[in-house]
Curated annotation (Swiss-Prot):
Keywords: Bacterial flagellum, Cell outer membrane, Membrane, Signal. The lineage of its organism: Bacteria, Pseudomonadati, Pseudomonadota, Alphaproteobacteria, Hyphomicrobiales. The keyword Membrane applies. The gene is flgH1. This is Flagellar L-ring protein 1. It holds the Pfam family FlgH. Its main location: membrane. Belongs to the FlgH family. The keyword Signal applies. GO terms for molecular function: cytoskeletal motor activity. The basal body constitutes a major portion of the flagellar organelle and consists of four rings (L,P,S, and M) mounted on a central rod.
Length: 254
């Protein structure tokens, strides 16, 4: 056995131990919780206040100058109202509205780039103040003192073919009213089927004027929309790489 292999063996053991420790930390408490739920269906999340969730941050957007409210004493209609007696649409914190998620995206992009260039230059001095007497003993041709030749080429191709579709409805709650009257909404829906939970999260900013008379709004009219559709359970566990493989993918440079 060479002395080099014996010298590097402790280092390999230390690296392996470090990788195992990182993998254990990466799994953390979630692995312990999942071990305690073996053979059981995944639990649904508790219904919590969205503003009290960890990491919640109030939305801040550019606002126009405040306008003085105008009142019409001889009018039976309230400004912005769509109903004769009362506006049933969401307009304050805690109100509910239905978000119609209708996403149909299709993209087909193809790019192709070709580039080539060839350059050649010759430079020399045939005779300059008796330079031949110096170059002849050195066997140097004065007319070809410098010769350069370069060639470069590039060929690239790329294509994108994507098609996505998502159609569903989800109820959202108004979590914040901005100074200009726009509403910050957030909705979450969980559906458990056997041992898999499907999650749908919708959040964004809506204009009260875009809310329909039946208290619904299309997802295309939500500004800063954040729509997430995924799941957790046995199927997602199989689809994801193991913790050790994920750690190795992050740490290994090759």
């Amino acid at each position: 056995m060479s002395p080099f292999s014996s010298a590097f063996r402790p280092r390999r053991i230390a690296i392996s131990a470090l990788l195992l420790a990182i993998g254990a930390l990466a799994s953390g408490c979630s692995s312990i919780d999942r071990l305690s739920q073996i053979g059981e269906q995944p639990k649904l999340s508790a219904i919590d206040n969205p503003t009290a969730q960890p990491g919640y941050k109030p939305v801040q957007m550019p606002m126009p100058k405040p306008e003085v409210a105008s009142y019409n004493p001889n009018s039976l209609w309230r400004s912005g109202s769509r109903a004769f007696f009362k506006d049933q649409r969401a307009h304050q914190i805690g109100d509910l509205l239905t978000v119609t998620v209708n996403i149909t995206d299709k993209a087909n992009i193809a790019n192709e780039t070709q580039r080539s260039r060839t350059a050649k230059e010759d430079s020399g001095i045939t005779d300059f103040i008796g330079s031949q007497t110096v170059t002849q003993p050195l066997k140097v041709l004065p007319g070809r003192l410098l010769t350069t030749d370069s060639t470069s080429s590039a060929d690239g191709k790329g294509s994108v073919n994507r098609q996505e579709a998502l159609q569903t409805n989800v109820a959202a709650v108004v979590t914040q009213v901005l100074p200009n009257g726009n509403l910050v909404v957030e909705g979450k829906q969980e559906i458990r089927v056997n041992y898999e939970i499907r999650e749908l999260v919708v959040a964004g900013i809506v204009r009260p004027e875009d809310i329909q008379s039946d208290n619904t709004i299309d997802s295309s009219k939500i500004a800063q929309a954040r729509i997430a559709y995924g799941g957790r359970g046995q199927i997602m566990d199989v689809q994801q790489p193991r913790y050790g493989q994920q750690v190795m993918d992050v740490l290994l440079p090759f």
